[in-house]
């Protein structure tokens, strides 16, 4: 008899940076992947050519979230994991409509994972004890707060709390954890002065790159016991 095909891992926001690195990591392991993307970056074509199922999604509305969930339900009978990586980062700038800033942050970081976890729950269940995972990507600012990104920090804190609620709801079939990164990698346009200032905020004084996230995700996926926990990736920044 042939080997059973693994269930796919769903990655939201998989078209660039950490989401893209995770998608390629799993593809290289012959692990099927479903990726959501908002903007069609050239990297999406590479994922499609490698066999990934890429679905364009608009998470700015609940209707858009549910339309994406419907597409996933049509695509697969089960999921190995959901990695909630889709994110936005908006500051409270002078003149910015504050209610809109808060609504946007809550929509992408709270409404979207909340609705998807419920809509796709049946795809995660039925595969055995601790056989499925949900991983929320939160942020270092969940514990510290942020004076320049108040709505962002609040929405990520809500997602962090939701990790524990879904862990209680879905155990023991599904493990639910969160990863709280600070600086992982720089943007191409970041200048040398900014990079040095950012590096000095942590004890380790380095931007570790995507592999640090990938290694932690692999650990969480292979664990049969860890659930309802948040895992900081901050290089000791909390001790500065």
Swiss-Prot record:
GO annotation, biological process: one-carbon metabolic process
Record bears the keyword NADP: yes
Domain of life: Bacteria
Coiled coil: none
Record's catalysed reaction(s): (6S)-5,6,7,8-tetrahydrofolate + NADP(+) = 7,8-dihydrofolate + NADPH + H(+); 7,8-dihydromonapterin + NADPH + H(+) = 5,6,7,8-tetrahydromonapterin + NADP(+)
Claim: Oxidoreductase is one of the keywords in the record: yes
EC category name: oxidoreductase
GO terms, molecular function: dihydrofolate reductase activity
Alphabetized SUPFAM superfamilies for the sequence: NAD(P)-binding Rossmann-fold domains
Entry keyword set: NADP, One-carbon metabolism, Oxidoreductase
Residue positions of the active site: 152 (proton acceptor)
EC number of the protein: 1.5.1.50, 1.5.1.3
A Pfam family matched in the record: adh_short_C2
InterPro entries in the record: NAD(P)-bd_dom_sf (IPR036291), Sc_DH/Rdtase_CS (IPR020904), SDR_fam (IPR002347)
Entries under NCBIfam families matching the protein: PRK06483.1 (NF005066)
Stated family: Belongs to the short-chain dehydrogenases/reductases (SDR) family. FolM subfamily.
Function: Catalyzes the reduction of dihydromonapterin to tetrahydromonapterin. Also has lower activity with dihydrofolate.
Designated name of the protein: Dihydromonapterin reductase
Gene for this chain: folM
